[in-house]
Amino acid sequence: MFNNSIARFSIGLFVFIFMENSFCTDYNWSANLRYRLKTDTSNDVKENSVSSFSEMRSRISLDVLGDNATAHFILQDSRIVGTPANSAGVTGNTIGSALHQVYFTYEGYKQTFQIGRFELALGNQRIIAKNNWNNTGRSFEGILVKRKTKIGERLLFTLPVVETYDTEYDDSKDHVLSGMYWNIILPGIGKSSKIEPYIMNYQQVQDNGSYNMFGFRADLERNSILF
């Protein structure tokens, strides 16, 4: 039985194809399946006993490519094999798949606008990571603007993290991550050399959880050795 995620996936796909059919000519499909066996090493495991479980993650991706506008859909199913929520071997409703990513991009002059639900990796995943090593991964919902500059690239983003409309009734109390991130290339030092300054703000009025973060990271290449 189709769940709400699959229905939203299908509706979004068909609406986009219908609206952009006049210039969209390319469609790229891809799929992957990852199986992983893990062992439990906690103190709860009795001596001379082995406790293990299996994780499985599958993804189906579709890219709809137009002249200036593109749409990207990634439907993901992530589960631990054999858990009761799967209803394995039993007639019933299983846990549902979900849209891990669904976003649209528009290519303008020196700028790219991206809106929807997407992964965001900054600073070689040291600043913000996709967390794809786990069984689910991390994605954000919001707006991302990329602008090419003479010295590299600038990113501007705003990402609502927690919506509190049903409890606080005040937009200022929503949890929002926003900021700017620069990729500044340094060809005079090495081909792959760059510095990445950033400014970020996390808004969480409750419990005084808001904070600002300033910093930078650097990749410096010398004689083909990257530091």
Protein language model annotation of sequence segments:
Residues F14-F16:
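Hydrophobic alpha-helical segments of integral membrane proteins
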